[in-house]
Design a protein with these regions (language model features):
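Short, charged beta-turn/beta-strand-edge "cap" motif at the junction between a beta-strand
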Residues: 113-119
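General beta-strand recognition
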Residues: 62-64, 234, 262
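Flexible low-complexity loop/turn motifs enriched in small/helix-breaking residues
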Residues: 22, 27-33, 38-42, 53-58, ...
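Short beta-strand edge/turn micro-motifs at domain boundaries
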Residues: 249-271
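Sec-dependent N-terminal signal peptides of Gram-positive bacterial secreted proteins and lipoproteins
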Residues: 1-29
Length: 271
């Protein structure tokens, strides 16, 4: 009888020992499998894809953008140079386009692997870019400036620069202001500087005593309001060369309709 009891106890011990080993082996195998699985949340994973929206600063042979407000990319840098690797580039209609087709102010959806090189501008490599919109307000400012630029072209004769007072500009980031100034440089092929009348006089650029800007004209946009819903800007504007050479208008309006900006002048003046 005692032998039978001993055999039963021995059998139970062996069963428990064998089960414990099996559980331990199973647990180790599970950990090994988890360690070998890739972390799909890792932005450095070559197969991962990250997208963000950005606005075009410059485009052509290369692409420079500024990330949208609140994006992780903006935390890295306010300017990003986008490298091209077998790029897929589409317009808003899904048609293939080239970098040369992009314009300053275009809003892009950019796909990349999540890697941002720390430099200034920061650098990424993109595999796909899609145009999803455009900043029409930038074009609105350019339209207002171009309208006054073409008024009384005699004031523009024999100049070397265009000075712009940007202190009254609204609804624009500093980079968007730079986009406008860069676009002016390309459009008019003159040196573009910024400053108020007094700032330019303090720098000796404007002769304050004789009220004369020998080498340029001074353009001022002021009294600006913007209705984003109707895409309408109200403004006053002036172009100044001297005390006896200036033009402008007050309470003018710029409206975006049918894909373009139109200017309606308010009360005009000349001196």
């Amino acid at each position: 009888m005692n032998k039978i009891i001993k055999l039963i106890i021995l059998s139970l011990v062996l069963i428990l020992f064998t089960g414990g080993c099996t559980f331990a082996n199973s647990k180790d195998t599970g950990n090994t499998d988890n360690q070998n699985q890739p972390n799909t949340d890792d932005p450095n994973d070559k197969d991962s894809k990250v997208t963000f929206q950005a606005e075009v600063i410059e485009a052509g042979d290369s692409l420079l953008v500024t990330p949208e407000k609140g994006s992780n990319e903006l935390k890295s840098s306010d300017k990003i140079s986008v490298g091209i690797t077998e790029l897929i580039l589409k317009d808003q209609n899904g048609e293939d386009i080239t970098l040369q087709d992009l314009k300053p102010g275009d809003i892009l959806k950019i796909t990349y692997d999540g890697t941002i090189l720390e430099s200034y501008p920061a650098q990424i490599k993109s595999s796909a870019i899609e145009v999803v919109g455009h900043n029409n307000l930038i074009d609105g400012y350019l339209a207002m400036i171009d309208d006054i630029w073409n008024e009384d072209s005699g004031l523009n004769s024999e100049i070397e620069m265009i000075a712009v007072d940007t202190t009254g500009w609204i609804n624009l980031t500093d980079i968007e202001k730079d986009i406008i100034l860069t676009s002016m440089k390309k459009a008019y092929d003159y040196k573009i500087i910024t400053g108020t009348f007094d700032e330019l006089a303090d720098q000796g650029i404007i002769d304050k005593e004789h009220l004369y800007f020998e080498n340029g004209v001074h353009i001022v946009l002021s009294d600006l309001t913007y209705d984003e819903k109707t895409e309408t800007i109200t403004f006053s504007v002036s172009k100044w060369r001297s005390g006896r050479g200036a033009i402008g208008s007050n309470n003018s309006k710029a409206e975006y309709k049918d894909g373009k900006w139109s200017i309606t002048k308010g009360a005009q003046w000349i001196s």
